[in-house]
């Protein structure tokens, strides 16, 4: 149990002081079966998928370009929206406790089938070596690429299939999930406490975080929250919350000032489906839901066909003989349908890897050939877990590099606008490169949105301390996490694990891009 600092509908908790009472409650089945869960907090993370493109220049077949200097743009605008729901502090403790129960049983179930433990990678701590450190997506991607290379040494052609489950979390069938949950517990039906937790995950309610702002705006910069009220609650009550009490929360709803929404995930038959993404229990439920699917793929593809199978959440990859690809593809799609899920047809891809001559000396190397409607597209990369693999090389996914560059440009634009607003006629306006570099070298986890500056390297930990007037004031204690990762340390880890220097070369344009961005935004 850890103290969390985020704002929610109910009070933040003092775990260090009251952990025994919290533990007693969450481990009491009779308490949990009657417990009324709070509404979740809902927000949406938008991930930009396509850049502006020029209709005449630098236009490839996918209508994408990464050229920063072009001005004659049209828009090919798409954004991936990921809905996130997160629970109140106490509810999160309950979800975390029941997630630990299910996760222990799930891990035991994986180890009962030889090879199944290796197939499922996401949301699990898979120990790397005797140091106790866990594997990362870098290790998982390398294992797949190494498998393709190893097979190419003894096979003329190696086949690869990739699948993506469409809207995974928001499409889980409730009846199937409940059955798999009770089966894992070894029960005919869920015990009352588990049943109540299940209902809170499937028949959930939520509020929109933006509805708690001072003014609700459909576009433009969002207004802030009622900082005067938040400060008053902190000072007088000694906790962080949008509301000072349950009565305050209920009155706000009764007065029509805050709307409560119900689970909005429905299938084509208008039947409610899905679980929230963002709860401490969501990950293990997603893995549990596909447990039988993973077992069937292991038996059919790995054991019967001699294939190689890995699933990372909703990303599926299979390495097999080329002659078996069509049969395996149909089998996977039919099996997913039995789970009342759907494979994204636009993200289903087929590859053949084989040796190909690449120079006048007739030298050959392992090369990827993407299979597209009966044709082959040479050198089209296999994209998996943020990497592009062409057989003869592995590099960071180009869109991830572009995202890093966009963040850099965003920082320059904000700093330039600030310099222009604050300019003194006697002082030349300037943006200092070293300050920019310090910002874009900050930890990956501190990146707060595509168009916002990066947060500080250290994290301020705040504590509410009662003073002699029986009021609470905020005490700030800086905390430096030396293990935080930034984009450059990630690149170094890639180079170490893959034993390749190609990754740092992908960032060779950063200085040029920085200078170009400064020249453009500072002199506009």
List the predicted regions and their residue ranges:
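Conserved polymerase palm-domain catalytic core
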Residues: 155-312, 317-329, 379
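Short amphipathic alpha-helices in soluble, non-transmembrane regions
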Residues: 328-336
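A conserved non-catalytic segment of reverse transcriptases
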Residues: 199-253, 346-432
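Short, conserved non-catalytic motifs in the polymerase core
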Residues: 51, 56-96, 113-132, 162, ...
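Active-site-proximal segment of RNA-dependent polymerases
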Residues: 99-174, 196-216
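Active-site and adjacent loop segments of nucleotide-processing enzymes
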Residues: 273, 277-280, 365-524
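Beta-rich nucleic-acid/ligand-interaction surfaces
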Residues: 119-125, 309, 317-320, 349-359
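Non-catalytic, polymerase-adjacent accessory regions of viral genome-replication enzymes
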Residues: 1-77, 494-524
């Amino acid at each position: 149990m850890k103290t969390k600092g985020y704002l929610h509908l109910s009070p933040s908790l003092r775990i260090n002081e009251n952990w025994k009472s919290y533990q007693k409650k969450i481990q009491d089945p009779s308490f949990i079966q009657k417990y009324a869960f709070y509404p979740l907090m809902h927000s949406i993370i938008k991930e930009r998928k396509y850049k502006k493109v020029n209709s005449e220049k630098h236009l490839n077949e996918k209508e994408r370009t990464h050229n920063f200097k072009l001005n004659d743009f049209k828009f090919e605008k798409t954004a991936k929206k990921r809905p996130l729901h997160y629970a109140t502090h106490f509810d999160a403790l309950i979800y975390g406790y029941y997630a630990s129960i299910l996760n222990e049983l799930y891990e035991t179930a994986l180890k009962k089938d030889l090879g199944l433990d290796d197939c499922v990678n996401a949301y699990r701590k898979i120990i790397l070596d005797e140091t106790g450190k866990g594997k990362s997506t870098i290790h998982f991607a390398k294992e797949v690429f190494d498998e393709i290379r190893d097979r190419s040494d003894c096979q003329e052609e190696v086949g690869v299939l990739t699948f993506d489950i469409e809207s995974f979390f928001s499409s889980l069938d409730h009846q199937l999930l409940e059955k798999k949950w009770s089966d894992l517990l070894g029960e005919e039906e869920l015990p009352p406490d588990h049943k109540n937790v299940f209902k809170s995950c499937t028949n959930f309610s939520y509020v929109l975080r933006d509805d708690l702002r001072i003014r609700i705006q459909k576009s433009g910069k969002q207004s802030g929250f009622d900082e005067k009220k938040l400060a008053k609650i902190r000072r007088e009550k000694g906790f962080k919350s949008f509301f000072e009490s349950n009565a305050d929360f209920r009155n706000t709803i009764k007065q029509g000032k805050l709307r409560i929404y119900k689970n909005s995930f429905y299938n084509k038959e208008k039947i409610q489906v899905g679980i929230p993404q963002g709860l401490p229990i969501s990950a293990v439920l997603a893995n549990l839901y596909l447990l039988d699917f993973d077992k069937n793929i292991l038996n059919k593809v790995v054991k019967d066909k001699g294939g190689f199978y890995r699933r990372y959440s909703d990303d599926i990859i299979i390495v097999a003989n080329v002659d078996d690809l069509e049969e395996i593809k149909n089998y996977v799609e039919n099996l997913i349908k039995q789970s009342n899920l759907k494979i994204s047809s636009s993200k289903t891809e087929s590859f053949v890897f084989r040796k190909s001559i690449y120079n006048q000396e007739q030298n050959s190397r392992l090369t990827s050939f993407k299979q597209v409607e009966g044709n082959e597209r040479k050198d089209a990369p296999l994209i998996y877990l943020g990497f592009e693999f062409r057989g003869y090389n592995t590099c960071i996914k180009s869109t991830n590099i572009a995202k890093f560059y966009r963040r850099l440009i965003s920082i320059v634009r904000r700093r330039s606008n600030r310099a222009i607003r604050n300019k003194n006629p006697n002082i030349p306006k300037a943006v200092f490169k070293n300050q920019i570099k310090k910002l874009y070298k900050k930890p990956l986890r501190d990146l707060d949105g595509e168009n916002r500056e990066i947060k500080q390297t250290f994290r301020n930990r705040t504590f509410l301390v009662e003073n002699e007037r029986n009021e609470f004031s905020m005490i700030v204690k800086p905390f430096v996490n030396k293990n935080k990762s930034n984009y450059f340390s990630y690149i170094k880890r890639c180079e170490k694990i893959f034993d390749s220097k190609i990754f740092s070369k992908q960032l060779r344009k950063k200085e040029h891009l920085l200078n170009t961005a400064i020249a453009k935004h500072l002199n506009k």
